[in-house]
Amino acid sequence: EALVTAKRQGILEEVLACLSDADQMPFRDYIAMLVQTHIVHAHRRWEEMGLVAQTLRETGVDPLMTEAIERSHRRTVDAGIAPANGQVPSLDDALTILSEKVIRGI
């Protein structure tokens, strides 16, 4: 969705350049970092995904994946798990928090 929109807006290379930050560390570490920082930054990321969804719609793209990410982040926000001190937890602690307080079974 994002890349189609970037292409339509003529900014594909700029978007790809921003995404290249992921190349700076091993993929395993990058994924762990995303999970760990999700605990702290879910609220900001949720708001950002809302803006992304709006931009996609304005470009004529149905934001299916973006809305799923937005809902996932909202679930974390609603769980109220962001640490008051802003401390990023270890991967193990982050997964425990998500498992016990955010991601419920059906």
Regions found by a protein language model. Give the residues of each.
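Short, basic/aromatic-enriched C-terminal tail that caps enzymatic domains
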Residues: 86-106
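Helical "substrate-binding/catalytic lid" subdomain
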Residues: 1-87
